[in-house]
Amino acid sequence: MSEIHLNKAAYIHNLTKICDKAGGKENVIVVLKDNAYGHGARLIASEAKKFGIKNCAVKSECEANEIADIFENILILSHVPTGDESAKFTYAINDIDALLKIKENTKINLAIDTGMHRNGLDISELDYAFEILARRNLELLGAYTHFRASDELNADYFVQRENFSAAKAKILALCDEFGIKKPIFHSHNSAALERASEIKDEMVRVGIAQYGYAQFNGSLNLKPVLSLWAKRVSRRVLKSGQSVGYGAKFIAKDDINVATYDLGYGDGLLRYNGLGELRLANGELILGKISMDSFSCKDSGEWVCVFEDANVWAEFFGTINYDILVKLSPNITRKFI
């Protein structure tokens, strides 16, 4: 069966670089949503915990429950309130309605909309928000924002940073007014951490950077953690003039030794239609279309590395490395090496 190999040395290297930039392990929230960006949530969570990371963020209660025995401090970013929230977790508040619907006495983080206009409270809503959280005895542990373009060299990042500074000042004033303990602030995602000369928040939230992908090449000297491996199912001699795969997109000009390997778009690979040159990590071309459960190439032995840098496939398909990674099926065996 196909496998995902996780390079432990690379992961530790990346965490070390991130923590150095953030000012310490205690200042880092690792983002483990969507199966740790396809890497395997429990494996990554365990290694991060061993390294000394104490805080993480996930998408949902389901994801939080998966690693609840590993991390004590788990922030759920995309929760829709049910009124039955767990005391084990901290929940992001993404609009005023969430404050009204979430279970009383629940631990929360306020998401602040500083310009992305996806989730979060507007600064003008903070007075009302504090009235609600005080009345409902909600435990305010943190407040944060998300930068919409920290990976682009334009003014958006600086505008949002100033907006968040204003929101922080307002929140601190309201905490004094309502007798509420000062929350932890966090705003810097991976790209923002890379470009920041100074971090004025207590914590940073890093997702893609811990897995080895920088938005600004060389800024943190990160190393990709994941490599994808396929196992040979069969092999044969493809005669000159014969084709392999659906649609006969590849026709051999000479006799060649070909093999079929056990990965396809059913396992989360983007579907290659046989046009253009899509290469494996060893430089060999994928021959013909990728099938649901397999692909073919020149026989490369019992195992072949499909990719060890998601950017290669992202560039070919005109997408981003996140897209390549998060689609990888949870059914693929994952292990640290």
Curated annotation (Swiss-Prot):
Keywords: Isomerase, Pyridoxal phosphate. It holds the Pfam family Ala_racemase_N. GO terms for molecular function: alanine racemase activity; pyridoxal phosphate binding. It catalyses: L-alanine = D-alanine. The active site is at residues 33, 246. It is an enzyme of class 5 (isomerase). Substrate binds at residues 118, 292. Its cofactor is pyridoxal 5'-phosphate. Pathway: Amino-acid biosynthesis; D-alanine biosynthesis; D-alanine from L-alanine: step 1/1. GO terms for cellular component: cytosol. One of its GO terms (biological process) is D-alanine biosynthetic process. InterPro entries: Ala_racemase, Ala_racemase/Decarboxylase_C, Ala_racemase_C, Ala_racemase_N, Ala_racemase_pyridoxalP-BS, PLP-binding_barrel. It comes from the Bacteria. The modification N6-(pyridoxal phosphate)lysine is found at residue 33. Its EC number is 5.1.1.1. CDD domains: PLPDE_III_AR. Belongs to the alanine racemase family. Catalyzes the interconversion of L-alanine and D-alanine. May also act on other amino acids. This is Alanine racemase. The gene is alr.
